[in-house]
A protein has these predicted regions:
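Single conserved hydrophobic/aromatic residue that forms the stacking wall/gate
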Residues: 1-11
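C-terminal substrate-binding subdomain of Rossmann-fold SDR/epimerase-dehydratase oxidoreductases
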Residues: 9-169
Length: 169
């Protein structure tokens, strides 16, 4: 789901939108192929009898299906004008950004459990609390996005299922 300013620039050149640009907040850099992903899984021991995850498993994360990132981005470019992004009747133009996400969070431990159940993994998941957890919470406020008419449709459970089915095929 690696959209960049370049995509926004191309979209603008096509004269569809002229007043918005899109930038990813975080995610895969867009260059990984299936072989690289599998080698990373192997490198970190995800093919063995146990998986060691850094931290306590308590941090909360939000996940968005990649195609929905694309869908939301196109929706914004086609349906949202810059003036829709700030409060009317004020001379201040503030808080004009639009967060794209689900607004729903899950702990790393719960996500690991979900993946274990989906994949029927028989090994053990071990949390190494001597390693850092990272930021304890990463959640986007999607209230503006919802007010503008776009909502995600694929929850984390369905996303994990779809990803695993893709991997198997």
């Amino acid at each position: 789901f690696c959209l960049s300013r370049g995509l926004g620039d191309v979209y603008k050149r096509q004269a569809i939108r002229k007043d918005l640009s899109l930038r990813p907040v975080e995610g895969v850099d867009g260059t990984a192929n299936e072989g690289e992903i599998l080698s990373v899984l192997h490198k970190y021991g995800i093919t063995g009898p146990s998986v060691v995850l850094w931290g306590t498993g308590k941090p909360l994360r939000e996940f968005l299906w990649s195609e929905e990132m694309a869908d939301a981005s196109v929706y914004i470019m086609e349906h949202v004008n810059f003036e829709d992004t700030y409060q009317k009747g004020t001379k201040d133009v503030r808080n004009c950004h639009i967060n794209i996400g689900t607004g729903k969070e899950i702990t790393i431990a719960a996500l690991a459990d979900l993946i274990v159940k989906e994949t029927k993994y028989q090994g053990k998941v071990i949390f190494d609390s001597t390693k850092p957890d990272g930021t304890m919470r990463k959640l986007t406020d999607v209230s503006k996005l919802h007010a503008l008419g776009w909502h995600h449709r694929i929850d984390i459970e369905e996303g994990v299922h779809k990803m695993y089915q893709w991997y198997l095929s």
